[in-house]
Amino acid sequence: MRLVLACVGRLKAGAERDLVTRYVDRIRPAGRPLGLGPCDMIEIPESAARRAEDRMAEEGAALLAALPAGAGLIALDPRGRQLSSEDFATRMAAQRDGGLPALAFIIGGADGLADAVRDKAALMVAYGTATFPHQLVRVMLAEQIYRAVTILAGHPYHRA
């Protein structure tokens, strides 16, 4: 199952981009025997619309249009569920075992996700009640995807 990290906005060169790339690159060899990967990154430009609702709608439509056909969706959203790394891995495996060709992890723009994206998500995940910069959320999500792959593989990376 192909994995896709789809985000609004571009990560500039720097430490955050390097970390995301490091985890995405690690997913391919670790996930191949499990039928997971490769992991591709899709970056959608931020909308220039004046109203937040219009920005979210434009960004949401662009995100959904960029995803592979038949992809399952896991969206990061403050209204989502807080999952342990093990639960996250189990949810990923369930999507894979359901025969999906791809699983997309969605990070919205500064205004959040459009209802159209939330409605299509099989799962919404929150990283707590605090607000984090989008750059760090991408790093955290890429690491959690890699961690989930290693949990499913029985690799010692995850020791909890």
Curated annotation (Swiss-Prot):
It catalyses: pseudouridine(1915) in 23S rRNA + S-adenosyl-L-methionine = N(3)-methylpseudouridine(1915) in 23S rRNA + S-adenosyl-L-homocysteine + H(+). This is Ribosomal RNA large subunit methyltransferase H. Belongs to the RNA methyltransferase RlmH family. Keywords: Cytoplasm, Methyltransferase, rRNA processing, S-adenosyl-L-methionine, Transferase. It comes from the Bacteria. Its EC number is 2.1.1.177. It is found in: Cytoplasm. It is an enzyme of class 2 (transferase). Homodimer. One of its GO terms (molecular function) is rRNA (pseudouridine-N3-)-methyltransferase activity. Gene3D superfamilies: 3.40.1280.10. SUPFAM superfamilies: alpha/beta knot (SSF75217). One of its GO terms (cellular component) is cytoplasm. Specifically methylates the pseudouridine at position 1915 (m3Psi1915) in 23S rRNA. S-adenosyl-L-methionine binds at residues 76, 108. Its main location: cytoplasm. PANTHER family: METHYLTRANSFERASE, RIBOSOMAL RNA LARGE SUBUNIT METHYLTRANSFERASE H. InterPro entries: Alpha/beta_knot_MTases, RlmH-like, tRNA_m1G_MTases_N.
